[in-house]
Curated annotation (Swiss-Prot):
EC number from the UniProt entry: 6.1.1.14
Natural source organism: Desulforudis audaxviator (strain MP104C)
Complex formation: Tetramer of two alpha and two beta subunits.
Protein name from the UniProt record: Glycine--tRNA ligase beta subunit
NCBIfam families: glyS
GO cellular component terms, A-Z: cytosol
Length: 688
């Protein structure tokens, strides 16, 4: 009989960042194992808190589904003679499958009939299977930094302290890492009554909530957000949406209670990042703002427990935050004693990477790349000067106490200190914008100088790493090279900006001045492949089909924005009534054109009018296509190319390309090569 199943793995405190992927994997592998064991169910979900990972399955079958297997044997004519008497082939096959020969059945496979052995395996009880499945599931979970404890060789995210496993009202027993499963769980570490008996799986959620544990992360997030907003509203304030902080806070606790604390209003004189960073990043508090978005001298924290004694908890948190803000204020005022531009020489003492020199040398490379990009992207004289100045100052804030204590403020504090040193607002903004887009963020540089610096910094990092033979492998990417490549793609796609990355990376390589160990050509090829992989995923994530993406990228992707515009034009072109015929015609031409020795066409060698017709059509269309490509009007270029379909079809209908006469054959191949290459300036339609 179907009944709910609860499997709970009780652990020491799991870091908040590990919880979401652990629950996703628990659900995924739970589904896979239940399918493997043929156990039917209505619904499955994973829940968790810092102290437990829970798989809950609704209406799990009481028995395994029976398995019917049909094993193909010899052809019927070989298994039985004309009188229907089994031959040695039939007898041997039946014996090998453990069935009686009279139980063999026949099945038609096309025009031939074969004999089959039908074997039925009775389903085992779910309790028996779950005792096997439980240890397999727990052992299959993978974590970034698993631990061992005691004398166990078993590894898990944190030490396992208990295992609850109940199917309906039946206890499922097994052992993992020396811990025996049973019908017991534990509530809140400080507020519950101790060990709790789960008599049936359906009691699980209610029992834990009565003991101050909200197992469902989504419900905890809702509770946290409602309480945080209410606490801020009590001080006539609001809290900005912050899904990342909300998720982290919800995964740090089991039973939320929010409170609103305050800090001295004098701290509001400091730049906002100096206040928000200690609150958000270090204390996991929600800053409170007024109706205009300005910070108020309040914060909202969330306590893991009930609302009892909240005044005492609030007071303790206020003391902690005041100490944090006092430190931040001291660092900020200390930093102002040395103007940002005066810190540059000290970068000679800061190592960028051991094999890639100092931060001072990196700044020199960024300055050179800023000059190159200013020309490549068409910056005016004012913007060029701003980009140059921003590059010179770009890393000076790394020497400040604020950035040393709060590394996440790099660039942000550079902007603040640049403004206080009298730098132009665009220069100060560019120093901040060099790190945009931030991981998971959508903000892009608003200044041209910021775009230049953001591109230059990432290119220097990528070329330096690849130039020293360092590339991401599998899940390992210690220098976040994939993220930096995606950052370049987003910058060029969404700003938007046209830039030849091959040329850009050659400039970045040259800026290292012979320091790199991998040859320039090899680095260029590796980076081209690396970016191609990123763009395949990115373009498909933005709604383009696999075929469209492959067709566009096959025509080149050194210019990311240009590749995107070609791809979107091809996607639109797919709706052309004759697209399939055009694609087929191009593919035929392209396949034969691979045999062409060149592209020189001699009209005097034409033997048939269809050759003249195709050549004249090509000349006329080429002029239109090249004019449209020069303006990046790829939709219009494809529309012009569509006019070649009929002449190409007539060409193939009228002549044989691979004739014995070499000169005629090569002339026809060259003509097809011209046609194919014209298409491939936009996309390779043979990829469809």
């Amino acid at each position: 009989m179907a009944a709910d199943l609860v499997l709970e793995i009780g652990t020491e405190e799991i870091p908040a960042r590990f919880l979401p992927p652990a629950l996703a994997e628990l659900a995924e592998k739970g589904r896979a194992l239940l399918a493997e064991y043929r156990l039917a169910y209505a619904d499955l979900a994973a829940y968790g808190t810092p102290r437990r990972l829970t798989l809950y399955v609704r209406d799990l079958a009481g028995d395994q589904a029976p398995l019917v297997q049909e094993i193909k044997g010899p052809p019927k004519k070989a298994a039985f003679d004309i009188d229907g008497v089994p031959t040695k082939a039939a007898l041997g096959f039946a014996r090998s499958q453990g069935v009686a020969v009279e139980d063999l059945v026949t099945r038609a496979v096309g025009p031939v009939e074969y004999v089959y052995a039908v074997r039925q395996e009775t389903g085992r009880p779910a309790a028996e299977i779950l005792a096997e499945l439980g240890p397999r599931l727990i052992g299959a979970l993978v974590f970034p930094r698993p631990m061992r404890w005691g004398d166990q060789d078993f590894r898990f995210v944190r030490p396992i302290r208990w295992i609850l496993c109940v199917h309906g009202d039946r206890v499922i027993e097994f052992t993992v890492a020396g811990v025996r499963s049973g019908p017991h769980t534990w509530g809140h570490r400080f507020l519950s009554a101790g060990r709790l008996l789960v008599t049936t799986a359906g009691d699980y959620f209610t029992l834990l909530e009565e003991n101050f544990v909200i197992v469902d992360p989504a419900r905890r997030r809702e509770m946290v957000w409602e309480q945080v907003r209410a606490a801020a509203a009590a001080e006539s304030g609001t809290v900005a949406d912050d899904p990342e902080l909300l998720a982290e806070v919800a995964d740090l606790l089991e039973y939320p209670s929010a409170f609103c604390g305050c800090f001295p209003e004098s701290y509001l004189e400091l730049p906002e990042p100096v206040l928000v960073t200690p609150m958000r990043e270090h204390q996991r508090y929600f800053p409170v703002r007024d109706g205009t978005g300005r910070l108020m001298p309040f914060f909202v924290g969330v306590h893991n427990g009930t609302a009892e004694h909240l005044n005492l908890i609030r007071s303790g948190n206020e003391k902690v935050l005041r100490a944090r803000l006092a430190d931040a204020a001291f660092f900020f005022r200390e930093d102002l004693e040395v103007p940002l531009p005066d810190r540059g020489p000290e970068l000679k003492k800061v190592v960028f990477q051991e094999s890639l020199g100092t931060m001072h040398e990196k700044v020199e490379r960024l300055t050179a790349l800023a000059g190159y990009l200013s020309s490549a992207l068409g910056l005016d004289e004012t913007e060029r000067a701003q980009a140059h100045r921003a590059a010179v100052l770009s890393k000076n804030d790394l020497l400040t106490s604020m950035v040393y204590e709060f590394p996440e403020l790099q660039g942000i504090m550079g902007r603040e200190y640049a403004l206080r040193a009298g730098e132009a607002p665009a220069v100060a903004e560019a120093i901040r914008e060099q790190y945009l887009p931030a991981p998971g963020g959508e903000e892009l540089p608003a200044t041209r100088a910021g775009l230049v610096l953001a591109l230059a910094d990432r290119a220097d990092n990528l070329v330096g790493a690849f130039g020293m033979g360092v590339q991401p492998t599998g899940s390992q990417d210690p220098y976040a090279l994939r993220r930096q490549a995606l950052g370049i793609c987003h910058l060029l796609l969404d700003t938007p900006a046209y830039l030849d990355l091959d040329d850009f990376f050659r400039e970045a390589y040259a800026a290292y001045g012979g320091r790199l160990t991998v040859e320039a050509g090899e680095v260029a090829a590796q980076l081209a492949d690396f970016f191609g992989q990123r763009l395949r995923v990115l373009f498909q994530d933005r709604g383009l089909s696999y075929g469209v993406v492959e067709a566009a990228l096959a025509a080149g992707h050194a210019d990311v924005r240009d590749a995107w515009e070609r791809a979107t034009a091809v996607a639109t072109f797919q709706s052309h009534p004759a697209f399939a015929d055009i694609s087929t015609a191009f593919t035929r031409a392209n396949n034969l054109a691979k045999n062409a020795a060149g592209t020189r066409v001699e009209p005097a060698l034409f033997k048939d009018p269809v050759e003249h017709t195709l050549y004249q059509a090509f000349l006329q269309v080429r002029e239109q296509v090249e004019a449209q490509i020069a303006r990046r009007r790829y939709g219009a270029a494809l529309a012009a190319l569509a006019e070649l379909r009929e002449p190409v079809d007539r060409f193939f209908d009228g002549v044989m390309v691979m004739v014995e006469e070499a000169a005629v054959r090569e002339n026809r191949l060259a003509l097809l090569r011209l046609v194919a290459d014209l298409f491939k300036g936009i996309a390779d339609l043979s990829k469809f």
